[in-house]
């Protein structure tokens, strides 16, 4: 029996082979043929939206096979920066001029595109000379700048009947038989995901139909990598360790990074840690060979080494072990809400502490340590930076600690508010005293003005005439003296000294 994954071996090569998506495929054909006839559609991008495992990626490659396109695939969760995306797209344009085959640009996981890159990708769509197809689980999570420029084609979730038919066709081509109840159980657990169902079918056949119930018991399409690793590290049984990761929708190289990150938290003896990393090293070698040679049958051996090999490496720590995401891909796995909270905290640090962005990012790392170890000091930072409760939880990474810090910050704010109210009252009292003193001063000054006015009113006409005559007499005496001074010789410094 071949080791090639059945999802690749039996991937449809024609659009007509895709399971129960006729309406969606009709729209896709019309859109592509408009490009081929030299009349590109008004919306130059196509957005395929629907649940996992319904045929979105398969549509792209079947389309390329039928119409002779060369696919240039990008993954939004891996190539998030605009510079990388632009480099690939510009390369596609260049190859279009020099090469003979037309290019089809495929952007997978478009709902994971960074907002900063979305605007630039929208510009690339505007000037596109080749068809651009994107895929997403939820079209409303695709950035608006891109979504508005794309024709949306919705794929429906497959029924259990659809999945069973597809599984039966594969079994016939393999010359195998599986009990109906097992097929029904696979279809039920797949929850509309044909890719997951095919993987389960191959696992059941490889492990033996008699173990099908045990194998399927581990299958959970919604299982997170945290749950899978918790099961993996909790057992020292090789078979259970391999079954633990069946429900994780993740490539082997990604899973390797997760396991690699958590080995030191699970094992405490140096020799056990060394054995675990030796198993991971062998897994990495198999993955590298599979990538270079295209022999993806090596994935099975890589998975065995990174699961069973690690699980039986030695004695594990007792009690609960927290699972940590890999540092190298942590930023890529953050949810949109987490990225938004992170950016918000960084902006507040930049504003309140007058820092550049890189300094603020570095400061955030120190804040995490403070929030982890010193709730009292952390509470003061919450007030100083005006952090929200969600931002506190983001920095802390622990809901219980976040609640404690938030409660302390509320007490500080109440205290500051009370002090502020007292200060405001004191200032108001001071203002009132000053106003009262000013009013008293004004009232004391009014009689003097009245007195002056009375004195001016008491002058008689005779006194006014005498004053005028006196002014005229003084003026006549001063005038000749001024004229005499003008006619005299100009005094010099020598004359002044002679005197």
Curated annotation (Swiss-Prot):
GO terms for molecular function: ATP binding; ATP hydrolysis activity; DNA clamp loader activity. CDD domains: AAA, HLD_clamp_RFC. ATP binds at residues 50-57. Signal peptide: none annotated. Residues 428-499 are annotated as: Disordered. The keyword Cell inner membrane does not apply. Keywords: ATP-binding, DNA replication, Nucleotide-binding. GO terms for biological process: DNA replication. The keyword Signal does not apply. Residues 473-484 have a biased composition (Basic and acidic residues). It comes from the Archaea. Residues 436-472 have a biased composition (Acidic residues). Heteromultimer composed of small subunits (RfcS) and large subunits (RfcL). Belongs to the activator 1 small subunits family. RfcL subfamily. Part of the RFC clamp loader complex which loads the PCNA sliding clamp onto DNA. This is Replication factor C large subunit. It comes from Thermococcus kodakarensis (strain ATCC BAA-918 / JCM 12380 / KOD1).
